[in-house]
C-alpha cells in the first residue's frame, strides 16, 4: 500500500499552538501515522459524511478526510473533545 500524502488545513495547524505541549507531540505523531494507515484502530467514521473520520489522542480529536483516489489525507480540524465538533 502506498504512503498517503498529508495536508493540514491552516486553521487546524493554528490550533496546535493553543494545545499544551505534552499533547502536541502525540497529535503530530498520530497525524504522521495516518500516512501509513489512514484507518487506524479506534478511528470512527462521521455519520452523514462520505470520507470523514476522527481519531482520539487523549482528550483531543483529529478530524480528517481520506481521498483514496488522490492518495491524500486532509486534516480538517484538531481540538479538545468538547469544542471540536462545533462548526
Please place each PLM-identified region on the residue numbering.
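A short, surface-exposed loop/turn module that caps and links secondary-structure elements
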Residues: 31-55
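Enriched for short, Lys/Arg-rich terminal
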Residues: 2-7, 11-26, 40, 56-60, ...
